[in-house]
Structures are given as C-alpha cells and as structure tokens.
C-alpha cells in the first residue's frame, strides 16, 4: 500500500496500454464470476483467485497450502499466491481487446478532446468510431504526385475502352435493328409493329450509353476523389471507398472505427500542429483564432507532458479489484452483485465473440458490427448513458458505470473519501443538564463504558483486577461492580467531543469533560445550546472520543466549550443567558415600588440577607446597603471626600446585591434592571476584558441564579394573562369608517383600484399600530406575558399583538397584501374567512424554510470549496497596503460617535498605518489590534477613518498572513499561523443562511419590478452573476442630460473631456438617482437597483468591485439582523479575484485567453523579464465561487466538488500535479490536513536538550559525542528531565 506521508504531490495522467498491462496481475478471459455450486471463483473469470489473490487469508484455491507459514508461495497446482485476502482490494486485472476502442471521456466530453486534437467535428468523429464512415489515415502524396500522369493516362485508356465498347455495342444493336425492320417489311407487317421494334431498340441503346456514361462518371469521381484526397478525409460512401481501395490502395491507407483513429494518432505530428496553430493565432481573427486557441490548449497539453495521444485509444481495458465490485449472497440464496460486473461481462462476451469471428475470417460487415458493439460495451463500462441510451438492468434501471462510482453525493469522493464513519463514537437523545458546569456534559454510564472499553480493560489489568485482556473484557461485558469505579477513574479529565448535525459552523463540535449519569440520554449544558442550535424536543447528538494524548490536548485546549464562548463570525459571545435564565435575572434585578421593607438601611449585604431570610424585606424592595470591597456603579456620583476603595452606601434592592455576587470581583456594581440586551452587554464586556476561565465561571453563576430565581418568580402564562385593550372596538370603528369612505370614493370612480388598495393598506396598518400601542399601555408591568417580552426572554410585541391585539394585514398567494385585515386576535378567535386567508402565509413560511435549508446548505458547500485552501501561512507578508474604513461619524450634536458598522469592519483588525489626530500626534500606532479600547481612543481623538490591513490587500503567495487577517474572532487574539481561516469564513457566511428570507419583494404590489433579496441575492453576488434588470453605471464623468420618450427615459452623460456623449436608456418605472444638470463621477449609479459586478470591475477596477461585493453581501445579512465580520466575506472575494485572463502571451509559456492564477502570471512575467523577454499582459477576472472552485490548481479538490468526469478528463490530459496544499486533497488521500497542528512548522519541531539536561545524561552513559538522538516524543534513554528545563528555541511556537 502507498504510505501517504512519503509523497508531496499526486499526478494524474493518461494510461497507455502498457501501463494497464503493468498494473495487471493477469488477463480476465471468461465472463464467469463464481461457481454457483461451490460458490468459489471461476478460473480466468472476473473473480479469479489466480489473478486477484486468495479469498481466504493464507489459503490457496485448491487447499494444498493453508496457514501463514506458506506465505508468499505460489501453488503449483492452482497458481494462487498464498497471502492475505485483502490483496483482492488492490490487485487489478485486464482484458486484452481484439480490436482497439476509444475512451468515451476524450471523445464525448465537452469539448471533445479527440476532436480538438484531430480538428474533427464530434459528429464526424462519431461516424468513424461507430463504423458509419471511413477515414483516410495516410496518403503517399509523393508517389501519387509522381504517378499521377501514368494513372491519368490509364484512366483515360480505360475510359476510351469503355467508349469503344459502347460504340461497338451500339453499332451491333443498330445492325440488328435494321435486319429486324427489313424482315418485318418483307413479312408486310403493319407500321405499328415496326414502330414498337424501333422504340425497343432505341431504348436498349440509350440504356447502353447511360450505363457506360455512369461508369465513366464513376471513374471520373473516383479519380477526382483520389487526386484531392487528404489525410483525415471522411468517406461515408462504402462503394466509392472500395473502388478507391481496389484501384489506388497502394497510395493511401484508411479504415473505420478506433483502429483508424489509432493509426492516425500514431502518425500525428504534435510539434508541427502546435506551430501551425500558433501561426493561425498570430495572423487569424474572430472565430478562426478562437478555435485555434482552444485546439492549441489540447495540443500543447500533449506536447508539454509525457502523455501520448495514443492513450485515448485503448488496446486493453483494466479490470478493477474484485472487492471493489463485490458479489454477495443474499438470504434467499440469490446473489447481489455490483453493476460493474454486468458491464464487464458484456465487454468480455463481445470481445470473445469478436476474437472467434476474426479467427473464422468472417466477412468485414459482420466483424465491423461486432467491433461497434465492443466499442459500445466499453463506453457503457466507462460512462454509461454518455452516448445513446444507457444500458439498463432489471426494472429498467441504468447500470452504474465507473464514472457513476465517482460522481455525486454517493460517489467515491464524497461518500467514502471525504466522509467516513468513525469508530469510538455513539449517539443518543439530549436532555438539559442545569447542574453542569460550562465545560461538562452528562454521559450515560452504558455509553461511557462502551466508548472507554479499551481504556477500562487496560486499567483493570494494571490494577490486577484481571489477569489478562481477555478476562478484563469479560468483566466489562458482565458489568462487574469494580468496572464502574475503574470507568470513573478512566474518564477523569479525558474530554469527549459532542456533535450535533447539521454541523453548520465549527461550534457544532465541542469538547466536554464527561460526568457519568444514570439513564440513556446525554446531558447538555444550557448555555451551549445556542452554538449547537440544539433544543430538547428530541434532538440527538453524537459523541466521539479523542484517543491519543495529542488529540486529547487539542480537544482540551482548542475545543473545550469554555474556550469557545465567542462566535467565530462576529467575535461576540454566543454563550448568552436565554429564556428562563433571562427571566430569572430580570426578576432578580427588578425594583418594585412599595414592597415589604422599603426604605430600610443595612450595614452590609450579610445583614440584608438575614432580613430577607427572616421575611422582613422583599427581594425587590428599595433599600439602602453599605457596600465594602466593591467597585461603585459607573453612574454613581461619589461624595467630595470619597476615594477609591472606601465604603459607600447605595440605594438598591437585595436582589441586585445577590446578582452582583455572581459577577467577578472588582466588576462595577450593577444597579439596574437587566433585560436580555443588558445581560448580553455585560457578557460582552466580560469576554473583552477578563480571562476565559473567569468568563465561564461568571456565566455558570448567572445561569444558576437565573434558573433559581426564574423558578421563584412564578412567571407562568394563563389565558387570562393575554389581556386585550378595552378600547379595541372604538379604535376599529374609527378606522372602519375611514375605510368605508375610501371604498365609496372608489365606487364613485374618484380612485383607481391601485390607489384604493394602497390607501386601505395604509389605513389598516395604522389601525394595527394604534391597537398595538393601546395593548402595550394596557398591560400591567407584572403581567407574565409582558414580563417575558419585556425581559427579552421570549417572543416580541408583534407576536403579542397577534395574541391580544389584532392580527392585521396578511398577503395572498401572489405576494400582494390583502386590503381587508384580520381584526380578531387569537385570544378571541378568528372567523372562518379570517382563518382561511391566514393559512397561505403560514404554509408559505413552512415551505420556504424547507427550501431555504437546502439552498443554504449548497451555498455553504460551494463557499467551503472555494476557500478551503486559505490558511494563515505566515506571520506577516510585509505589505504597506490596506483598506480605508470608517470608524466614526458625527452624531446629531456634532460629536463623533462610533460608526454602527465599525463592529464588522474595523473591529478586530490590525491597523495598516498610524492613527494620527489633527495635531499630527500618533494616537494608535500601525500594527496595533483594533479592539474596543483602541477604537474608543481613536474616536476620542476625533479621527473618522483608519486604514486597516485586509485579506484583500494581503500579498502572501498562498493563503493569507496573520497581520492582514487580524484578530481571530473566536479567540480574541491575533490569529495563529496554521488557522484554516477560509473554512471559518465559509461557515460564518453559510451558517446564518437559513435565517435569510427566500422571497423576492414586490415593490408596492407592482408586478415585474422585483428586487432580489435574502439568500438568492447572496448567491447572485458570490456567483458573480449579472443581476436581472441591472442598473447601469457611468463609464465617464460629466454632466447629466435627461431626455424623455413615451416608453423610456434616456440619461445622456456629456463627458468633461469633450469626447462623444454616452446615452443610457432607462425604463420609466425605475427611480432615477440623478437630476438634469448634475455632475457625476465615473462609476456613478444612474437608477436604483442592483449593479453588475463585472461592469464595476471593468470601469472602476478590482479594488472597487471588492468593496462593492463586501458591501452588498453585508446589506443582506444586516437586513436580517445577522452580524458577520467583513473579513470573512473578503476572504471569499479574494478567492473570486485570484485569476487573470491572459490577453497577449509575450514570450511566456502562457496561452492567450488562458485563465491563470495571478501568482503564477506574475512569476512567469518575472522570469521572462529577467531573461530580457517580452512579458505577458492580462486583465483581472471576477469568477463566481462555483467556477473558481472548479478552476483551482488542485484537481483532487475540483473533482470532489462537481463535474467530476470533466475535471478528471482535463487533469489527465494536462498531466496535472496536485501539490496537496488545501485541506480537501489531504483528507481525500488520508494525510494530516495542513492546518492547525498539522502544518509543517508545528509537525517538524525537534526538542533540543539544554546544557543541564546534557549534564544529567552523563550519569546514564547515554550521551554520545555529536548530539543526542531522540525518537518520537523524546523517547531517548536517560533520566526524565522536567519539561520546563527544555529550551524550545525558535524552531516554532510550541503551543
């Protein structure tokens, strides 16, 4: 087997017949599979043991050799090698074909590679391959030229002979006619009889002349065809071809089928063809030049690689190992087999029949038909259904060919190589575990015992509870009491991974320390539910066990839930108190007027606690408490003589004192009622300023307090708590009358239907809002429903409005708003009509959700694919460039306030240049991480814009550098080298995809003028599609003139430089952004709507199109209230603009019109310029994510994404080499991924001993001059040296 760690590249190429024979362990000659009586493989058949290896370990076919001691012997009786049965997974066979066949991928793919190489149309190629036309493969032009006069003379002689013969025959007939007529006259026959005889004779003579003329014409045609015959001419007329072959067979060769192509390819001069194509490209224009370019790509692919074009025609077919196309016996004694066996059997049957026909010397027509059938059988084996009707099995199901084995979700790539099943894992239903700490999970005992079985068994043997592993295993299976104690010991501090499908982002898998629990359900900490998107209505989760010490260390350090509090998408905490916890804290921090014990003073919190326990003071009563060792609230005004650290008295409640005990020491006292937003702000602040351990502890304390006081608060919802506003009827009456007035105006013809609708919609929207206000005012503050909404625990006012106010307006299936509202609420109940019209919205919601989930998943998959090789490869690329971002804007009072988008643009980035205030003083130097503190300093200094480093301007050749990426949002520190930031970016954009809406909004119910929004808009942007009804942008700067016609506006721009005016026709329905006489700059948008990104790239250049795309994507996410950092979107856009289109190739090896990566283009140009050559020129290209994924340098990654056969065909012809830099390629071949601790700078760390360590080793005599040899993980002999005495030097940061 290949050892994946011993190669750095993987090349794919075209296999020649010799390669196939070299791989093979023998020829498969018979179509038989297994003997149905003995169930043993047939000799020379598709499962033959002699070819593929034994079916049982160390046992030959006939049974002469059994047992491992005969290893490697080949049995002289049956010829089977004695070895392991697993060789049947890797040994191949082959079928020697009686006639060559073409490989369907190269003939039938789009574009047809064979067609491009030979310059034949695919239709003509098909005629040759499937025996419908002859092809001339060779013409001896010199001999033809030499002998042409002789041949022409010979043909002339033949024609003359025919003429002479014709004349003689006609003369003979003429004489016979005269004799006949004389005889008739002598007999005195009538004129009628004489005329008949004459006509008959003339007819015969005419036929004679025609027959000879046809022969002469045929001779001319044959000779003309021969004179003008060229290599690769097709001749569909079989008779003509035979005539040519009989007469001039010495001067040319021709044939049908793959044989003809094979002969043609053998004589094909690649170098000469390439030269003539380059000449055509230099001198040609238009269509001709374009075709020559495409052909040159294929020709130069064969020229530049070791591939031979002969590889596209096969003399033998490989047979894949039998264990990859198994045959298994079912219960009923029948057999189930892989479709491939059927396809192979068809090939073998037809091949054997063809061999027999050739041996018998059968007529050409029969042989050709058999060859055609063999070609079709091989086509079906390689790619069934690519040409003609697919071969079907029982029940008309198309058989799965070799190509189908690779393609799609069930194919080899995605099913078996990128997604494998995992040992040491289990799954179960989840339930909540409120008693757990943030880093813990509850693991059912049975499950833990099964998962940790090997560990428990080893420990039992170590502790002498069992003699050997076998008895230990028996003890575990019988669950002896001692086993549970050992299990408890084994799982201590051994983290497990929990995963909930769908794993939309990296927080879908986190590590926890297991706690054994009774029952069969896994227990989950309530605060990690947000990250997993889990609830307890029957969700299941999978458990995985990290085995090695390194895996455990990584799980504990990188994946432990208490280390993953921040969201990788926005850098803000995800582990927020929610639902009951919010209610509890809200209740705890509430201040109730007139409660028991109001106005009392206490000397300390402890005294207040005693009073509370004695029921003398209520939890929410306003009291005065003297606080010591406490930081006062930020809004507290201290007395004149107060200094920090003094005791102070505060008017607060006992509940708030309890709440503050949950917060870290030294945190400012919180003296306010905390709803969800305020609680989130506190957690946010903690995450920004405190170590993770403390944040986790505080979150746990808040969780416990929340649950405890939510229970004590007694918040429950009864139907009586849903209180409708008492004046609802009056409000409705008022608006009802207004609606009637509008209806009357419409009936009288004062309003159009459109106006009536919009007026009614406006009236009822107003009514709904009025009722919502009345309802809100009507709720008492302690009403449980109101408390739930007010605290932010659950629901919002819109939902409460539907319960207690009125449902309001709904839309119909067309997407228009129905102008009659639903006046009832759910508390009163709806009428039948109201219920009916509201069903549409409800159903659409569910249908939309289902569609969105699939679309969003597909978007995530494409994003991951395009960005999977973006890894932080170096500390700093050293670029000076950056992008300008707005960090502050002027508020209403003219004071600078933080820009609302600074959170997703400037936050967590590295400054590219110093932030300098008006006096020229450096406030924050370049290279600083822009956290909340730095941003506040910059704003206080009156600076509005800063230049920050960005992935868009990073100059790393591969991936990005740590400085340009900035802070890792998930950890809050500068990103580590080796972090797979591309995958994180893709997950951050894809994960909220399900929340985005699907619908296309109608502007005010007008059909047509739709704006694409939500998920489809994000897809449109990332796929770089031209939007429907795109808004034009100006190509020059100048003044605007607007001309109106009946149907359109014409916006004319008069350029400043006096060149020709440019007119932009615009639909009358669009909203103009410019007015007559305005002066506009290049790239200004003329009307509202979506702009074509390709236009932006063409007119304004790459930087502007990057910023435009970031901005547009953010617009969609912001409209749904989703916070994603710009840097994630930038990484995807960097990948979309990675390539350039070569315009002129200069002296480089690049081809004009070729797409190539910018890095390769620049390197090639540098090479040429250094040798004094002419560099190439190119223009940047914006590629959609699907195209960019398929255009990647890695053929493994592209093939596992989409269009597998096309990618592999292309890669094989170009002998593409995959340098295994991305993640997917390495997962596919089973190597460690080059990210995180798998990156070479962490893998190749050598631990050098210090001087003290060397000295300590003298005593053991293990020291040899020339250094110390260490095996893996320092397994040198000698005494153990304390770890902290080792000096790791600068060989890499050892985390």
From Swiss-Prot:
GO terms for cellular component: DNA-directed RNA polymerase complex. The keyword tRNA-binding does not apply. Keywords: DNA-directed RNA polymerase, Magnesium, Metal-binding, Nucleotidyltransferase, Transcription, Transferase, Zinc. Its EC number is 2.7.7.6. InterPro entries: DNA-dir_RpoC_beta_prime, DNA-dir_RpoC_beta_prime_bact, RNA_pol_asu, RNA_pol_N, RNA_pol_Rpb1_1, RNA_pol_Rpb1_3, RNA_pol_Rpb1_3_sf, RNA_pol_Rpb1_4. It catalyses: RNA(n) + a ribonucleoside 5'-triphosphate = RNA(n+1) + diphosphate. One of its GO terms (biological process) is DNA-templated transcription. Binds 1 Mg(2+) ion per subunit. The keyword Transcription applies. It is an enzyme of class 2 (transferase). Zn(2+) 2 binds at residues 877, 954, 961, 964. The gene is rpoC. Its cofactor is Mg(2+); Zn(2+). It comes from Frankia casuarinae (strain DSM 45818 / CECT 9043 / HFP020203 / CcI3). Zn(2+) 1 binds at residues 60, 62, 75, 78. The RNAP catalytic core consists of 2 alpha, 1 beta, 1 beta' and 1 omega subunit. When a sigma factor is associated with the core the holoenzyme is formed, which can initiate transcription. DNA-dependent RNA polymerase catalyzes the transcription of DNA into RNA using the four ribonucleoside triphosphates as substrates. Belongs to the RNA polymerase beta' chain family. GO terms for molecular function: DNA binding; DNA-directed RNA polymerase activity; magnesium ion binding; zinc ion binding. This is DNA-directed RNA polymerase subunit beta'. Pfam families: RNA_pol_Rpb1_1 (PF04997), RNA_pol_Rpb1_2 (PF00623), RNA_pol_Rpb1_3 (PF04983), RNA_pol_Rpb1_4 (PF05000), RNA_pol_Rpb1_5 (PF04998). Mg(2+) binds at residues 535, 537, 539.
